[in-house]
């Protein structure tokens, strides 16, 4: 058996779910192998999905992505009927080669999960910055993490699992980043390798307003700190623990240094100026490389505004650390990014 299915949780996604389903079907997946979880939508999302002839599982009320997946895993026989299970977000459009690449990767011995490469759909200067952030993450970090076996998160918009691995995952609701939670579970339980494949390409809609961007970054960062505390990664000594500490520690150090620029400027204006000039030059170079690689001229044109977003990134990262790790505040819930 070498069958593959797609599971697509959706809540009020009438604007984008048609494009998502069309791309999945155009990539070669049969209608009978697509499962949409209509999580209490009130905008006709389930009806739109049903019009494509796919399977629609309806929740009478909104219970969230993690609980929806948990419920589906408990009541369905998907792990028995399929070899591979792919998770998608309702704003994701897959490339025509996506599922072929995923099947080949999951068919290798010892591979438990595959994460694809996400690209931000062009819309405005903020999505151009997210395009750059994704490019840096996938071009610099993900390949190295894959080779060393320390991928920290398989993104929810492009994650695929062996069915027997999917069946063993706990879709917990005690953290707000179910994709990272499941990734660390695979490492902790030694369920197999997690590999990154850049040809498993998807396009996703990212926040187009600063308000939505800040909310999303706060959720991601808070969730990452929650994962560290849940799995004892601050004091762990495995490879994934060290990678986690390296990434989060880097974020803390850079965040503090970046936000202290006004202080450095008051103490030593010349040193502060050199630091800003060097940082801007590196960011401009990366923007140019990303613009060429992804054929996104908007990434380069919007680069003068990236300093503002980096200030926001650092502020939100440190704020989430303070709330989650220092004050131990419990954060739950999710919000919907405005679609376009």
Regions found by a protein language model. Give the residues of each.
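Short, well-formed alpha-helical segments that are part of the catalytic scaffolds
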Residues: 12-26
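Acidic helix N-cap motif at the loop->helix transition within catalytic regions
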Residues: 15-19, 43-51, 97
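A conserved acidic beta->alpha catalytic loop
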Residues: 23, 30, 38-46, 61, ...
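Conserved donor nucleotide-binding strand/loop of the catalytic core
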Residues: 32-35, 46-75, 116-117
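Acidic donor-binding/catalytic loop of UDP-sugar-dependent glycosyltransferases
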Residues: 44, 90-105
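Short beta-strand-to-loop acidic/aromatic patch adjacent to the donor-nucleotide binding site
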Residues: 81-93
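Catalytic donor/gating beta->alpha subdomain of glycosyltransferases that bind UDP-sugars
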Residues: 106, 110-138, 173-176, 180-244, ...
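Membrane-embedded multi-pass helical conduit in multi-pass membrane proteins
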Residues: 250-329
């Amino acid at each position: 058996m070498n069958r593959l299915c797609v599971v697509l949780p959706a809540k009020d996604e009438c604007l984008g779910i048609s494009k998502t389903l069309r791309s999945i079907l155009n990539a070669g997946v049969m209608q009978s192998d697509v499962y949409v979880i209509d999580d209490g939508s009130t905008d006709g999302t389930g009806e739109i999905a049903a019009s494509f002839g796919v399977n629609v599982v309806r929740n009478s009320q909104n219970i969230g992505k993690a609980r929806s997946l948990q419920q589906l895993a408990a009541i369905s026989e998907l792990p028995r009927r399929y070899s591979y299970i792919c998770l998608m977000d309702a704003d994701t459009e897959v490339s025509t080669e996506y599922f072929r690449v995923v099947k080949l990767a999951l068919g290798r011995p010892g591979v438990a999960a595959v994460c694809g490469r996400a690209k931000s759909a062009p819309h405005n200067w903020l999505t151009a910055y997210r395009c750059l952030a994704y490019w840096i993450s996938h071009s610099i970090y993900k390949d190295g993490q894959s080779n060393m076996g320390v991928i920290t998160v398989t993104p929810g918009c492009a994650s695929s699992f062996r069915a027997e691995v999917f069946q063993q995952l706990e879709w917990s609701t005690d953290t707000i980043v179910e994709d990272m939670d499941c990734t660390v579970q695979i490492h902790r339980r030694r369920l197999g390798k997690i590999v990154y494949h850049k040809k498993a390409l998807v396009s996703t809609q990212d926040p187009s307003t600063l308000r939505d961007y800040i909310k999303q970054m706060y959720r991601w960062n808070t969730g990452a700190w929650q994962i560290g505390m849940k799995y004892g990664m601050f004091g762990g000594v495995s490879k994934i623990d060290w990678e986690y500490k390296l990434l989060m520690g880097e974020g803390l150090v850079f965040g503090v240094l970046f936000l202290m620029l006004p202080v450095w400027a008051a103490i030593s204006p010349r040193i502060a100026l050199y630091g800003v000039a060097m940082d801007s030059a590196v960011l401009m170079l990366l923007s140019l490389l990303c613009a060429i690689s992804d054929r996104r001229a908007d990434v380069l044109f919007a680069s003068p505004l990236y300093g503002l977003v980096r200030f926001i990134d650092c502020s939100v990262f440190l704020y989430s650390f303070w709330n989650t790790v220092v004050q131990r505040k419990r954060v739950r819930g999710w919000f919907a990014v405005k679609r376009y």
